[in-house]
Amino acid sequence: MNAEIVVNNSNFSSNTPPFLKKQPEIRRYIIQGSRRFSNYWWAFIVCLGSIGFLLTGISSYFEFQNLLHLQNYFSFANEAQSSLNKVELPIILFFPQGLVMCFYGILGLFLSFYLWFSIFLNIGAGFNEIYIYTGETLKTENQYSKSINSNNLKANNWNSSKIKSNLKKFTKMKDTQTIDYSSENELKNQLTNPNSAVCKFAKGGSEVGCWEQSALTPLPPTPLSHIRIFRWGFPGKNRKINLQYSIDQISAIKLEFLQGFNSKRTICLKLSDQREILLTGSPQGDWETFEQLEKQASELAKFLKVNLEFSS
């Protein structure tokens, strides 16, 4: 996680309730993918070495001395050139040495192609985005529907509180206690249609007008604090990997720092079901010292208000 961007979102509509107009604090951590110096280095070295193995194997098949024997073109002195020409280089037999070298050369070319293809697509790149809402939030649609008061309901020549009570009777007939978000649009269309049975039931009689179009407003999405993890993958259904977890699902931030031949420097997101989601770009990490890794993990745990675990 190389960079951190703090963004405040202030795009709210006029219909957004006041308790939802809290600007969330958003942090974005940019993740470096396959386009790093080490991948460029190994892709070049593997490609160069595999070409050398393949040319040596081909030269043994055609009984050439060596396709990479270039002293005739890069000699800097005639005396050195004449002395080198007197040396007879051994001819490599095609079976089994040349055949094995051709195999390793082709295998190396496939590996280098995989590395260059990963670099081109920037596999593993993405970001970790954290949304923290500090204001009052509602976790269910029923809580939102219960919070609607009579001032939000409008009617033509009718008491809005009576419409609300009649509507509750209607919803109880449908085995629901409050306005259901999934059927709100359908219910809104029925209430604005004077000839519908729902409208006649809600108004309580023919002398009462139906609800206006603004009586029911679409239910806004519930803003819950969450973390979004986005990564670029290989072409196919997993080209875009987009994971989202609620802050309530996060139990801790796990820090792993292992030294040695197979070093490991990672920051993981530990969920309540004991799953661990990698937050860094690679198992080797982007930090040189343990202090840098610890500082990044502690800031993240403090921002999420969760525990910090160590593993070494």
From Swiss-Prot:
Presence of keyword Cell wall biogenesis/degradation: no
Cellular compartment(s): Plastid, Chloroplast thylakoid membrane
GO CC annotation: chloroplast thylakoid membrane; photosystem I
Membrane protein topology class: Multi-pass membrane protein
Stored InterPro entries: PSI_Ycf4_assembly
Thylakoid is among the record's keywords: yes
Function: Seems to be required for the assembly of the photosystem I complex.
PANTHER family the UniProt entry points to: PHOTOSYSTEM I ASSEMBLY PROTEIN YCF4, PTHR33288
Entry protein name: Photosystem I assembly protein Ycf4
Organism of provenance: Pleurastrum terricola (Filamentous green alga)
